[in-house]
Amino acid sequence: MRLLKRKSRTFEIQVQDMTLHIQAATDVDEESRAAALWFWELLHTYSIRNPEFRSSKRPVKVPGDAPEIVREIASTAARAGVGPMFSLQGAVTDHVGRFLAREVNEVTVNCGGDYFIRSRRRQKLTVLRRPGSSVAVVVPANRQGLGVSMTLGHGPKRSEVDGLAVLAESCMLAGAAAAGVQAILTKENGLHGALTYLKQVTGVIGGVVFLGERIGMAGGLELAA
């Protein structure tokens, strides 16, 4: 993804197996690193004691005394009908972004195809597709922060997505819904089913799916001029 027409300071932080790329107007390196490490450790500790949380492809129930980030992941993934494993990366991205948004008005956090974007202006995203073409979509101006999950296909199967972007109220939900889309695409009439699914998941704003020569759009996602 490429953010167009925006100037800001860019840096990256490494937390174990995660690399977060951050754009912000001010110096928030140390705050970003501390927040990312804190959220990662919460998830890592919980996952060690509850390995199903990191490996299940289906919704998992968690106890009421679990850390807030764990409960939020479980609830969000269940809303999309998938397992919490698909929202882990987006959760850290989300929570770091929300933490920084308390200090700065404009911030983007990117981790492996998951994006938290808070901006007072509309942003244009370049959504890539295999084998190299692209389309630009719009992320509306927002004060709370929105999530985007993007996937670039890499296989020859007819049911395998060539490119995918989901825009949602959170990065966690975008990642979970993107996983749901890819699962549905393997079924008969998969593209139609995937677009219907995106319209039905509460909190998903919209999505675009590239499947072979076909392009499908759902929800309120807007193509950029």
Can you say where each PLM-predicted feature lies in the sequence?
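N-terminal basic/disordered segments at the start of proteins
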Residues: 1-28
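Conserved phosphate-binding loops in N-terminal lobes of ATP-dependent enzymes
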Residues: 19-52
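Short, ordered loop/turn segments at secondary-structure junctions
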Residues: 25-27, 113-114, 171, 212-213
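Catalytic cores of large soluble enzymes that bind and process phosphate-bearing ligands
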Residues: 27-31, 35, 61, 65, ...
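Conserved short hydrophobic interaction patches
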Residues: 39-42, 46, 180-184, 197
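An interfacial alpha-helical scaffold signature
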Residues: 39-49, 59-82, 132
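Flexible, glycine/charged-enriched surface loops at secondary-structure junctions
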Residues: 48-61, 105-107, 112, 187-218
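Conserved mixed alpha/beta catalytic, RNA-binding, or beta-rich assembly cores of soluble enzyme
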Residues: 71-82, 86-96, 100, 104-194, ...
